[in-house]
Amino acid sequence: MTNKLITSNLKNSLIFFGLLFSINLITNAQIKVGSLEELIPYLDDDNVNVKLKPGVYSITVEDVANGKYKKEVKLKNVSKVLLLFEGSNSTYDFTGVTINIETKVLQAFGKYQVHELQIIGNNNVLKNLTMIDDGSVHDAPARRATNIVMDGKNNRIEGFHVTTKGSYPYGYGDAFGKGGKVVIPHRKHSACLIRGESNHLKNSKFIHRSYGHCIFMQAASNPLIEGCYVEGEVRKTDDMLAETSGPAFNVDFMTVWGYKLPKGYMLSTGEAGIRAYNAGETIIDGKEYRRGTSNPTILNCTIKYMRTGVTIAHATGKKYVEGCTAIACENGFSLGSGEAVNCSADCVFGPVYSTTYERDKNYNADITILPASEPYYNGSSSVAYIGGSNHKITLKGGDETVAEGLFIKVGGDKNSIRLMHGNFPHQNDFKAHSFNLNNQTKFPVKLSHKSENVKVKSVGKITDLGVDNNIEQINK
């Protein structure tokens, strides 16, 4: 081969690789847009890197009336979607961006459910968006609404800050209905629904002022929720009973549970902080799936003032919770089975852990009971409620956490506000057998008459009303 030919081949190779490099730069170059109108055409694109100019943007009823938001997704029901991310392998950077969404927008589509933001593509990253529902907490959707819905696979939402408002009735939690049976018809508004395959919610903050779940999972396989903060509101039932007008007053405070709202309990005005369901629908690669939630992982999340902190009892497969904290919730953790590692909760308004069903088994937990974050108002008197079998549970905490009249219950009556007068008997008065409880706190332990073959080591006083329990009082 001549020197001239070698030089020519080398030159052609350099040109070829230069073109490839240039194409790669063009493909991955960040596209900057300055309005929502400019952003929307990129939401169904693959392989784009888009940045919305920092600033405050609004979505109004007038925008809907003018036809600016026409997207919809049909999955069991039709959902109207404001921002629908249909593409794949794309990144959307919302650093410094706030989108104010008028709460009246949730009524502007008529009797359709509304999703403010939904992903149905794959391998996308959405980051650093502030979403605010702008209006009254009482501006309920015409049907129901969700701020964020994640379908598709391998998507990540990171660094979001979401303020959720607009539901009916607001201020009573689930006392007057949550599912099919209701005393007061409700229109819920949840914050974030995770579905699909291996979707990831990371380092996001939710200020929840709505009747509905904050973060929940349906038809989700291998979901990961990491580093999130959830904050709802709570309200004393005594304050509800003091009302002299309004929806609860109009039904004489008769709950969906079949009796008048009891005094002495604290209820969240929302629902669960983090919750998993055993049913649902999702769409991945254009195909619809109907299934439950499997293999959820919850890491380093904090949940405050919600009905439950982390409740994933209805999920299947491996259920793993680590480094999570529940503060001033009605209930801290309910996993059914699975692991809660290095978690913490207070029992200010309810138990740090509660068994969901009598069939629950193989629950391994390490929970530190925190000092009270505010005055105790725990109507159930439960520090923890443990039924089922084959668990290994360790409860830790310093002397400052102990409050008079509260105790760890092993089986028997939960004394829950929702389970009085024989209501939902399948959720109460459980047998408890064949597990280990290591109570390193001074809270007393009460082994009910439905406990059997439970091995207990406890710093706190033990009362044993069961059969063949193995108890050991330990000094600390």
Regions from the language model: what does each represent?
Residues 61-62, 101-107, 135-142, 166-174, ...:
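Short glycine/acidic-rich loop motifs that flank beta-strands on beta-rich extracellular proteins
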Residues 40-45, 59-91, 100-127, 136-156, ...:
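Extracellular beta-strand-rich solenoid/capping regions of secreted or surface-exposed proteins
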Residues 1-30, 120, 151:
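Bacterial Sec-dependent N-terminal signal peptides
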Residues 27-38, 56:
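Right-handed parallel beta-helix/beta-solenoid
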Residues 81-83, 112-118, 145-149, 180-197, ...:
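Right-handed parallel beta-helix
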Residues 37-44, 60-65, 79-87, 92, ...:
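Short, T/G/N/S-enriched strand-turn elements that build extracellular solenoid repeat scaffolds
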Residues 52, 92-94, 121-128, 152, ...:
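All-beta strand scaffolds that present successive hydrophobic residues in beta-strands
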